[in-house]
Amino acid sequence: MTAWLLPENVEDVLPPQAWRLEAMRRALLDLFRERGYQLVIPPLIEYVESLLTGVGADLDLKTFKLVDQLSGRLMAVRADITPQVARIDAHLLGANAINRLCYTGSVLHTQSDGFHRSREPIQIGAEVYGDAGIEADLEILSLMLQGLAACGVEGVQLDVGHVGVYRALAQEAGFDNATEHELFCALQAKDASAVDVLTAGLPMALRDAFAALPQLYGGREVLAEARARLPHLPAVAAALDTLVSLDQALGGVELAYDLAELRGYGYHSGVVFAAYTRGRSHAIAQGGRYDEVGRVFGRARPATGFSMDLRELVVAGSASE
């Protein structure tokens, strides 16, 4: 076995990319500071129940675990910094005021998120706690776009969805947890036949609504189409109203709407979004609203935010030159 080989999907950052990555990190942190965000630096490891309780449970399969030699308790290497920032907001800052927090640091994944993608992303992000209004979502979206521009990333398209649409339909259908999860997987796979099978016993209006979700993808015309094709449930109407407001406020941004986009369904509670550049199949930045993120720590505060991987930004920024 060759001693210098690294594990699969784990790599060094070499010159000149290392300086480019560091320049982007500094530019983003300076931008966050200018916008009033406070920097926090959580630890690399924590007790597993802190990182994987509640909404953080979606990260379980991605998380490396080990036994603490001092306490004998199970610990975990963080796979995402957001649950840590939620803990800091809920337990350590201890105020009901709006908190604007930012962070950066390495995270570790047991599996890669995609072909040739690193299992050690260098995560950077910003979050707003304590503001349930759409203004906070707009602030976060604008900050993310400004951050991408500061890193030299051009040709950005935003894909936007709202998990409240699917959640409202699923509640109206009265699914048990297992069926709801199966339908979620079918929608993510765009498997129309599986969606038809799983919704076969529902009233026709709900069957048609679930079948329509994968087709509701495109420009702002999708929002009007959704109002026509989906049941007139209050939660669905509220979600679509939010998306219309975002569309009006982000008039100069290339937007695509995807009402079957349920990434982080167990984690997010409202708007979800991802930024793409031409020629790249995976997102270079992503985020959304996750109002229940602090419940396990005793304070379920409204929250919205985004994160990026500096490794991916270096590649995307280079491609824009």
Swiss-Prot record:
Record-level GO BP terms: histidyl-tRNA aminoacylation; L-histidine biosynthetic process
Source domain of life: Bacteria
This protein's record includes keyword Transmembrane: no
Record keywords, A-Z: Amino-acid biosynthesis, Cytoplasm, Histidine biosynthesis
Pathway, per record: Amino-acid biosynthesis; L-histidine biosynthesis; L-histidine from 5-phospho-alpha-D-ribose 1-diphosphate: step 1/9
Gene Ontology MF terms in the entry: histidine-tRNA ligase activity
Localization terms from the record: Cytoplasm
Pfam families found in the cross-reference section: tRNA-synt_His
GO annotation, cellular component aspect: cytoplasm
Subunit text: Heteromultimer composed of HisG and HisZ subunits.
Record function comment: Required for the first step of histidine biosynthesis. May allow the feedback regulation of ATP phosphoribosyltransferase activity by histidine.
Family affiliation: Belongs to the class-II aminoacyl-tRNA synthetase family. HisZ subfamily.
Record-linked PANTHER family: HISTIDINE--TRNA LIGASE, MITOCHONDRIAL-RELATED, HISTIDYL-TRNA SYNTHETASE
Stated name of the protein: ATP phosphoribosyltransferase regulatory subunit
Protein's organism: Thiobacillus denitrificans (strain ATCC 25259 / T1)
